[in-house]
């Protein structure tokens, strides 16, 4: 049964139909005042309001309307007039309903805060609507009822299910929402009482002499909002008993919905509002639609997609156009940028130890030709040299960070420079700056006792060689402490080797600052790195050479190990390893000037995050043999750190690679699904075709299966055609039989069972005998027989006595056809004409009795004598 919804009008004071001592009292006799006794006779005779009556329907906390109507005069004691319509009810209430009503039984209107008298009026209105519809057979203007017995009304009897849209259009049933709302209200009431005991700002204000009793301030708090629930001091005694709290005070053991909802912001709860947490004084807002912090905590590729704003540098050198949009790398302006604070402040804020220049790192460029120092970043990525240390002269700083050219260790084939014009070398290096920015704080872990730090950087003999041909260059990342834990995200990348042309050695240009940028290299072993490790060289240089424009990114399965000298007995402390995401460099790459030595020496052990290594697969023999020109200088306490600049191009390359991988996986899955469907179809054919299912163990080829299936389908089509032809023949025979039956039925009389002529004559003889007998007693019956004979003959020919049902139907049809006045008038007129012509009733009426007796004894009845 659908639930009727009632909405009280704003003004319940309606004009009285007739002046009355109590205009709104339909069934109320609670006040035995003298002014009510006058209308007692009228009130006791008629039940005014309807079907449902109670003794005290007005025991509510609201003010009675009769107290607001003013004094009662003598004119108010007139007789009451009952309004049989629902007009007066509509003046008091506005009634709406949804669905269909079935019965007029009492309805509690659960979920609606209605006064008892309003519930009585609504139920009486529904009862009167039922009475109007089913008893008075009139259409009710209020609501309609259905009887769920048969037909389409059975579907209309179903309970309507409402849904509520929450959040991002999430549908839930209205019952669940109502239940949750009730629990929410009770939950906040309990929380309010708990907060009041603790004395927070949500509790009501204190009164003199301490806190008032809880029921008293709760009554003051909620009496204006829920007057029926708590009421006031003026509430009548029977008021609380009339309220049904079953729906409101429901079970609140499950507070899942209320506990998981995000709490409103502190800005929405001003401290001066003492009752802002009260559920009766606030309404649900749009807080569930606000973004939640949990939505951002499950983004695994947060750092890969992070692109900080580009930091302006002090370099005035132009960059190649191909590297213009890629200058906003992860560490741009943040690792060794000009805006960095002092080393002491940076190390204290970021937890890093700035590298001091105590040890030189000499590297050599393997490519020669027109070198363009301006294509490399300014000295913000380069550590300053120690003026106290004497190193071989190198003309230009080593540009390993932003646009690294191909670097080759002695004995290995070099890479080729890009044909960019040579420009002036960069100015002097900046002052000493910390290695990492405070944007990425790393913790400095002091070395444990008995644990030695990494050795000093290795000095490489410069042997620059020219070589044409651009290509993408991977960023080498080596030499991190052993045991850095790799996070699950961020795969290893392997760069395919490219064509390595022969290059002629060239001499480096004279003059220039001697500095080498730090290069972080991972500890994943490659053949060259393994050979270097055998020669006791802890600092490894990754091969940078020309390759294809696309870089194939392969997950590395080699575990990361620390490449340190075999004779080093000390272990490196196990520190969690952080993987850095470095993007690939698209072709072409700018040339590199010959590197110069730089000094990298921290005062204590430096915790460096584990960086991603892009290791090219070593396949040539020259790459497998160790580099013989690698000489190491390993002072204790020195850490060789090589920084390779991150570029955001890797994320784009990895996105493209992920798209290709996803496309490949999708293609493979689609192909597998297609083949599985084909196999499933052939298995189904084996089960359907009788010639194949008869021999399940016999392996049949797909061509044979298709041929047998085609033959089987042809046979089924022939059988179906034969069956359709047979069915058509049967339909034709059925039509012929129906036509014959209809022809026979048309020959039957329309009045029912035919009466034989013999039976008709027998009935006429019985009628004549009866007329003769009755005429001998009274001659007037003969006159009556003349009038009734045509009706008797029509009755004898039309009425059937096969069954009581047919007798009833034929008798009613005979009455309608022959006994109506239009049919009786000509029949009686003909009978009177016959009587006038056959007797002397018009000339000598005294002779009529004798003529009647002679007619029944001598001549045929009804015939003229």
Swiss-Prot record:
Annotated region (Disordered), positions in chain: 15-41, 53-77, 334-392, 500-653
Protein localization: Nucleus
Modification note: Phosphorylation at Ser-568 by AMPK inactivates the DNA-binding activity.
Phosphoserine: residues carrying this PTM: 20, 23, 25, 196, 568, 615, 627, 644
Gene Ontology BP annotations: cellular response to glucose stimulus; energy homeostasis; fatty acid homeostasis; glucose homeostasis; glucose mediated signaling pathway; lipid biosynthetic process; negative regulation of DNA-templated transcription; negative regulation of oxidative phosphorylation
Positions of region (Leucine-zipper): 716-737
Bias-annotated ranges (Low complexity): 515-533
Phosphothreonine modifications at: 27
A GO CC annotation given for this chain: nucleus
Biological role: Transcriptional repressor. Binds to the canonical and non-canonical E box sequences 5'-CACGTG-3'.
Protein name: Carbohydrate-responsive element-binding protein
